């Protein structure tokens, strides 16, 4: 497996130096050659050659981006443009640091599979998870302009991320105003979720925090088709939950047992089953309005 380096664009298959997107977005004028490159790239995606950006079954890596957001979801043309412009798709191992705090970055990542978190830590090693990203989320669009992050980006379990160089994001934004708006919207949605996380830590008690987080994750995963019948996979450990909710592992264990005994929720073997959605939402004071789902 190629070592992941978020500080530079990843280039395998059709990368930034030889891909379709360069001919269309970066000012080259040999349109005949561009057409041949595009056709060749389309052929390879169709037969799913390893190293290109289509998923098995012909699904696009960006297919979940803004899914569930109604009219804000990308058109097929916009989605195809975004798909053709990705630098690379990277498979990453569990607990792999994808971006280190303070290090220069020149690319951003869209989660394709799995879960990725952003975390901050003290010098003594205490860790706080400050966000959790699911398939369809851009993890670090703020790095597009800031050029470094004030937190680490870490995969929770095995995951796949689609890498976009910042040059490509700039070209896409210039070429397609709707894509520029979608990147902005993605950042606004992140900010809304961050505010909800601040509220959760600042005003909710332990059981309420756990209930609120599980309600949020269920709602977000349901929007992208990854939660069915109030059940979903979640590779978080009790230690991870503690890092996200500022609770000890012992406290998390106690709360999960209480929720299970009250018939609200079961979390075991990395699977979540919500038995009473209405009661769990009431316990966590959960209002999904901040997720801006399609109505």
Model regions and ranges:
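Short glycine-rich, low-complexity segments
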Residues: 3, 15-19, 27
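Short hydrophobic alpha-helical segments enriched in small aliphatic residues
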Residues: 6, 30-32, 39
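Cyclic nucleotide-binding regulatory module and flanking cytosolic helices
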Residues: 42-94, 138-139, 144-146
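Cyclic nucleotide-binding regulatory domains
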Residues: 96-158
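Cyclic-nucleotide recognition modules
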Residues: 131-196
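Polybasic "coupling" helices that flank or enter modular domains
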Residues: 178-246
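Phosphate-/nucleic-acid-contacting segments
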Residues: 219-295
């Amino acid at each position: 497996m190629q070592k992941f380096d978020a500080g530079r664009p990843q280039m395998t298959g059709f990368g930034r130096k030889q891909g379709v997107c360069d001919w269309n977005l970066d000012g080259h004028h040999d349109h005949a050659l561009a057409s041949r490159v595009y056709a060749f790239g389309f052929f390879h995606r169709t037969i799913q050659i390893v190293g290109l950006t289509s998923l098995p079954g012909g699904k696009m890596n960006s297919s979940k981006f803004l899914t569930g957001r109604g009219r804000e979801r990308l058109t097929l043309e916009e989605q195809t443009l975004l798909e053709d412009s990705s630098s690379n798709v990277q498979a990453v191992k569990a607990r792999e640091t994808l971006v280190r705090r303070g290090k220069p970055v020149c690319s951003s990542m869209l989660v394709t599979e799995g879960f990725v978190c952003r975390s901050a830590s003290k010098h003594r090693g205490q860790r706080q998870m400050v966000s959790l990203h699911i398939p369809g989320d851009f993890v670090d669009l703020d790095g597009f302009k800031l050029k470094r992050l004030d937190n680490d980006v870490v995969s929770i379990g095995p995951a796949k991320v689609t890498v976009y160089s910042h040059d490509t994001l700039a070209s896409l934004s210039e070429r397609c105003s709707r894509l520029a708006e979608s990147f902005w919207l993605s950042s606004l949605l992140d900010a809304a979720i961050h505010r909800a996380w601040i509220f959760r830590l600042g005003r909710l008690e332990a059981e309420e925090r756990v209930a609120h987080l599980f309600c949020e994750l269920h709602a977000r995963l349901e929007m992208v088709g990854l939660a069915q019948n109030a059940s979903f996979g979640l590779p978080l450990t009790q230690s991870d939950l503690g890092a996200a909710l500022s609770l000890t592992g012992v406290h998390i264990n106690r709360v999960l047992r209480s929720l299970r005994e009250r018939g609200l929720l079961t979390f075991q073997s990395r699977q979540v089953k919500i038995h009473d959605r209405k009661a769990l939402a009431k316990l966590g004071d959960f209002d999904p309005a901040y997720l801006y789902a399609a109505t």
